């Protein structure tokens, strides 16, 4: 009996993988994203892990990618601004549909993205060259004009990123396959669908959760792990920007949510 059960479970794995792949492709199609591009985005976080990891063999390449004021940090800043822009544009369309709660949540999300963008570049301190007030410098790990490097704030934000990444990864599964969600009022289903990222963006958020978990509980002081963190943050902000853009675009097209 046990052997038969094990064999059945083994046979069910390829079937589950196949079903998941089909669902990712189908889900991407609802956002007018081709299967090819959906799978490119799906694998980019993993490919980036390999690229950033390999860059450690070259000090120049590593610095170019992960040092302050270099490629990944400025790319993060740009993605955060894009996320804020499309979140606000999407909220305007949501208000036009009288989806007030979803619109307000997108406005809050957009404001949050602007605040994070400012924090990422220390509100322009290294661009304009102003000094850090002594009171802030004394409690800031990098002696910069930002709050996210203040020890207590930093720990809180790291936990928020970890659980936020996990929630963003799980929410699409919950909204698509939970019987409780399917039985909920249409307004609730619509709201959760609005807030749910595309399935192919899942690895962007899962990488963030995995990295933050390792940093918080395993590699607490590793300099290599700290520098590597620029890539999971890039993936997270890319996921946010893509989510906001796809929602904005979907709201401007024939809406599958309101058709169902």
Enumerate the predicted regions with their spans.
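Short, intrinsically disordered terminal tails adjacent to the first/last structured region
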Residues: 1-30, 253-260
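N-terminal membrane topogenic signal
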Residues: 27-44, 192-196
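Juxtamembrane "helix-exit" motif on the non-cytosolic side of transmembrane helices
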Residues: 53-63, 178-179, 210-223
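Interfacial segments of alpha-helical transmembrane regions
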Residues: 95-114, 183-201
């Amino acid at each position: 009996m046990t052997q038969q059960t094990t064999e059945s479970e083994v046979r069910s794995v390829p079937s589950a993988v196949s079903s998941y792949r089909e669902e990712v492709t189908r889900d991407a199609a609802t956002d007018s994203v081709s299967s090819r591009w959906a799978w490119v985005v799906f694998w980019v976080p993993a490919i980036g892990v390999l690229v950033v990891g390999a860059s450690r063999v070259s000090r120049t390449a590593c610095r170019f990618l992960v040092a302050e004021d270099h490629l990944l940090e400025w790319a993060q800043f740009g993605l955060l601004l894009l996320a804020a822009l499309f979140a606000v544009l999407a909220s305007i369309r949501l208000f036009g549909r009288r989806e007030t709660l979803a619109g307000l949540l997108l406005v809050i999300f957009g404001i949050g993205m602007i605040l994070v963008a400012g924090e990422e570049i220390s509100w322009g301190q290294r661009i304009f060259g102003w000094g850090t007030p002594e009171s802030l410098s004394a409690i800031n790990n990098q002696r910069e004009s930002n709050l996210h490097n203040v020890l207590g704030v930093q720990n809180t934000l790291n936990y928020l990123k970890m659980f936020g990444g996990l929630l963003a990864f799980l929410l699409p599964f919950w909204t698509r396959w939970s019987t409780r969600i399917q039985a909920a009022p249409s307004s609730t289903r619509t709201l959760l669908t609005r807030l749910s990222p595309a399935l192919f963006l899942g690895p962007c958020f899962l990488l963030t959760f995995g990295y933050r978990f390792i940093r918080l509980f395993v590699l607490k002081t590793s300099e290599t792990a700290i520098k590597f963190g620029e890539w999971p943050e890039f993936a997270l902000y890319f996921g946010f920007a893509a989510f906001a853009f796809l929602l904005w675009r979907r709201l401007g097209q024939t809406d599958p949510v309101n058709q169902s």
